[in-house]
Amino acid sequence: MRWIKVMAGLLPMIGSKGADEKDSSQQRRLSRVVVPEHYDLHVKILDAGFCGSVGIRVMISQDVSEIVLNAKELEIRDAGIVVEGARIPGRVVVGEAEKELEVVRIVFPSSLRAGPGYLTMEFCGDYSNGLVGLYKSGGPKEVYSTHFEPTDARRAFPCFDQPDMKATFKISIDAGSKFTVLANTQAIPSLREEYGDRKIEYFEETCKMSTYLVAFVVGELSYIEDWSKDGVRLRVYGDSSEVEWGRYGLEVGKRCLEYFSEYFGVGYEFPRAGSAKIDMVGIPNFSSGAMENWGLITFRRESLLYVPGKSNVEDMKNVAGTVCHELGHMWFGNLVTMSWWDDLWLNEGFATWVSFKGMENIGSVVSWDVWGEFVLWNVVRGMVDDGLGKSHQIRMNVTDPGEIGEIFDSISYCKGASVIRMIERYVGESVFMLGIRRYIKEHMYGNGNAMSLWKAIGEEYGEDISEMVEGWISQAGYPVVSVQDCGSSLVLSQSRYSMLGKSDDSLWTIPVVVSWEGKGQERIELRGRETTVRKRSSVYKVNAEYGGFYRVLYDSAGLSGLESRIDSLSVVDRVNVIEDVFGLGFGLYGGLEHGLRRISEYYSDSYHVARSGIEKLLRLRSVFYDDAEIVSLIDKKVRKMILPCVGRIDVFDIGTSVESVSMNKYVLSVGVEVGIREAVEKVQELWRRHVEAGEELGELRWIVYKAVVDENLGYMMDKYKNGDTPGMRREVMNGFSGIKREENFLDVVGNLSQFSVEDIGVVIGSISRGGAFRDAMVEYVVSHGEELYLMVHKNAMLYNMIIMSLRHVSGDLIVEKVERFLSGIKHSGSNLSIEKVRNEIQWRRRMRGIREEVLRGLLPEAEK
């Protein structure tokens, strides 16, 4: 989810060609001369592959001599169309041009007249190796499952595979009798056919939906279930040995579904009231976190299953966030679908934002600072990635599948969600909610776009907001708002922020919210290059509650006032100050030396504040990883900041709340990283007790693994393969960042094929971040690039994870090797990742050019 140059003169705008239609357009989208209305899809699951048949009720709007639809890596035969009761055979054409464009042509002996028809064909295919299309997961018990977003339904059956060609589906699956068979809708027991050791399950007809949401799963599965107050059946499916671990996800799902039904003003009724259901299934091998197939959500196991007493708080947050994200899609994405993939951000950004809305409103099952998490993992991440040179706009014009897969990134998700939050905070929660309800009711079971959404919100707000919002989604980057304190007034001005010193003439309509000490908040629209605001108090904060997606550059008076009140700021406002000071310092806008001197004053024992501050120092440490003096000074500063907290930590009782556990874990992990003896000794004592007396490592598992990996690599590999919790594999891989022995490094990278295909990039990324073998890991990747591409079965998203591991280097020789490697990549779907790596490396080298400023900020006053 996360490939084609058009051969000039060979193919028109892909679609069903009328008799007089010319090959003039070279777009990849199917034409709408023929559109689907309904599919009868039958699939037979076999050991070595699959086969099936599809009948598609279509509407033809003008006379055509052929019908073109999508298919990839399928053998298609016996195609034809029934028109007015007579079947007309068609010739299947799949040449090199069609393969390149992932289509099949059904050519008829004479023109078909405009009107209805029933297109039929049979097909066979092999299971995909790349975790897309219809594929088979390994493990003790094999599971056959689908993953179609964005454009992989065509790997499983011939179809009109684009989001604006919605249709209804009747699905039937032929599989072994021992298997549970699931699809988007409920099975109809009275229609089940059994023969020999096999059965055919028939499923209720779906509502109109896009092909990427079609799904089916076949495997030996057990389930647990619950019902929402509106009568929706929710189930978690998994292996019988672990399905009980789905209780937490099931409870989150039920509560979130009930909240969303109320928030959106439309109940969940897929496919219809009385038979509505949501199945959530943990899949053994899965490329992303989850997939929002309507009525049948598929998950990576650790994103759905939580083991009380053994899983950690990160697992809990991951399960809650992922379940709420996918349920948000049931309305935003499924009920109303973007017309084309250029509005993908509307699906993913909205689902990301609304998942936090859901977590905030479902009671005690979520007991952490939801919006503090949102700021750290969405606003901060989105700003870092969007501030690095050649980013891309939120709404990005895409045509081929490779481009579509690339925009499942932090811009679509994190920046998209942050912009939505900014709009909601500006127009108000209730107005925004009413606008969302209006949008959904106007476009139910159809397609929408961003302009339709802004129109609906504007009608509730009483003012057109489209002009304000369009700048945020149609141009890359974001602004820095400079604040000049003129005594009785403030002058606010804007320019584009860049970490690479590449500004331009971009302008945004910025919904600025200023918090005045003792005077409340004021909303201001900064439309042009600058505006003047009457000053209401001497202390103020621009971008109240970190609600806007922009940085703020204060002059000395403004920043001094904020720093004098730093302890009274909310968590997100305090994080905002840290992020702005260092974000601007990292962009060479000035103030980095000041920020480094004051970082200890910005710091607090709040998890989100502490993490924000320390991460800035660790990011600098990563830039200067081969500079012993800088690394030593950063470690010294970090040790001084966190030592009191480390001293209070009891590794056998790590905390009583999610906040305290998160804080203590983070500080302890950093303490081990920067060599605090007490932190190392505490972790080693926990490991000793684990080995000698079976003490559970619990929340500290990955931190312990990182500390002891060199002496216990075999143990960790066993835990990777036979872990006690679904999340343990991730903890083992995180622990690889602690490898310091060359023989262990060579053992891991020399045997990457022993890891699941979706984990190979994670392992490489962990080692490349670790420091000891950063350059060596990068050397390995650039020397084995093609081998790694084949190892992940040419899955662009998984290969891009490997490419992104190259961004952590700065030295001249290794950077030259990385650039040669990047220049030689010819695989489609990696252009954005390549640019991100280049931009990150360019920024790192730019930062190394201000070493003296960094040194001045780190040195104690007496040593300057």
From Swiss-Prot:
Active site positions, chain numbering: 326
GO molecular function, one term: peptide binding
Cellular component, GO, one term: extracellular space
Keywords on record: Aminopeptidase, Hydrolase, Metal-binding, Metalloprotease, Protease, Zinc
One Pfam entry name: Peptidase_M1
Site feature location: Transition state stabilizer: 413
Cofactor(s) required, per the database record: Zn(2+)
Positions that bind substrate: 149, 289-293
Enzyme class, broadest EC rank: hydrolase
Cofactor, how bound (note): Binds 1 zinc ion per subunit.
Stored PROSITE patterns: ZINC_PROTEASE
Signal peptide bounds: none
InterPro entries reported in the protein's UniProt record: Aminopeptidase_N-like_N (IPR045357), Aminopeptidase_N-like_N_sf (IPR042097), ERAP1-like_C_dom (IPR024571), M1_APN-typ (IPR034016), Peptidase_M1 (IPR001930), Peptidase_M1_aminopeptidases (IPR050344), Peptidase_M1_dom (IPR014782), Peptidase_M4/M1_CTD_sf (IPR027268)
EC number: 3.4.11.-
Key word Cell wall biogenesis/degradation present: no
GO biological process: peptide catabolic process; proteolysis
Gene3D superfamilies: 1.25.50.20, 2.60.40.1910, Neutral Protease Domain 2, tricorn interacting facor f3 domain
The organism's place on the tree of life at top rank: Eukaryota
Binding site for Zn(2+): 325, 329, 348
Family: Belongs to the peptidase M1 family.
PANTHER family assigned: PROTEASE M1 ZINC METALLOPROTEASE, PUROMYCIN-SENSITIVE AMINOPEPTIDASE-RELATED
Protein's name according to its UniProt entry: Probable M1 family aminopeptidase 1
